[in-house]
Amino acid sequence: MARYVVCWMFTINNPTTLPVMRDEIKYMVYQVERGQEGTRHVQGYVEMKRRSSLKQMRGFFPGAHLEKRKGSQEEARSYCMKEDTRIEGPFEFGSFKLSCNDNLFDVIQDMRETHKRPLEYLYDCPNTFDRSKDTLYRVQAEMNKTKAMNSWRTSFSAWTSEVENIMAQPCHRRIIWVYGPNGGEGKTTYAKHLMKTRNAFYSPGGKSLDICRLYNYEDIVIFDIPRCKEDYLNYGLLEEFKNGIIQSGKYEPVLKIVEYVEVIVMANFLPKEGIFSEDRIKLVSC
């Protein structure tokens, strides 16, 4: 039996008193029954507000035989309301509310339908939360990402059409450099559009090892470089991506090899002279 449980089944043989509602209980149902051997007993199902230990439950239900609920909520409730063995009852306390089954698939489906946070399953689905909370938080992050991306709006201009036309003709050497010196030309907005509609990786720059680690074989790599990072842009990393061989030595050595990557730089500045050969950069002015 799990050490701490929310949902319990209980049986009290030859009861002298009947269970009463407590502040710790969210929902309870029971009835007085007569078993096959004629023993008078209380058969009940209880959902606690918090996970409780067997010791705690014995304090709440003295003399009861207690077990963790094994079936569904509805099955447990119905079992305590069956007519063929009933003497008195059934008696219900609190509000019965169906929650999703305590397994990863159903919890993820419920998250998608209700938009609940993972923490909200701590008590209703404790086993899934304990075993798979990291997965639930990743699902939540992906849901939040999808929601944010669906809210993005795109406005196109002449230069975005030029970029699309360039990408329509793959070239293993070419790096597309989108130059807009004033800001507000829509470079980041277009980067968002590519992330939303294409298999695109986005980076505002940073340490090369971190960028290599985050890259997950996307078809398009976008470097949206803010003005303050002009002096820190790693031009060699751009060539690594364009060459299709990206290496990271962070945590453990990683070598990523891809057939073709479209590299796009969005910047308020031009590339430094002498860094690239003339055929390497395709300049697009905003």
UniProtKB/Swiss-Prot annotation:
Domain (CRESS-DNA virus Rep endonuclease): residue spans on this chain: 2-96
GO biological process: DNA replication; rolling circle single-stranded viral DNA replication
Catalytic activity: ATP + H2O = ADP + phosphate + H(+)
Enzyme Commission number(s): 2.7.7.-, 3.1.21.-, 3.6.1.-
PROSITE patterns xref list: CRESS_DNA_REP
Cellular component terms per the entry's GO annotation: host cell nucleus
Protein's name according to its UniProt entry: Master replication protein
Organism ancestry: Viruses, Monodnaviria, Shotokuvirae, Cressdnaviricota, Arfiviricetes
Record text on cofactor binding: Divalent metal cations, possibly Mg(2+) or Mn(2+).
Motif RCR-1 positions after renumbering to this chain: 9-12
Biological source species: Banana bunchy top virus (isolate Autralia) (BBTV)
List of residues binding a divalent metal cation: 33, 41, 84
GO molecular function terms noted in the UniProt entry: ATP binding; ATP hydrolysis activity; DNA binding; endonuclease activity; metal ion binding; nucleotidyltransferase activity; RNA binding; RNA helicase activity
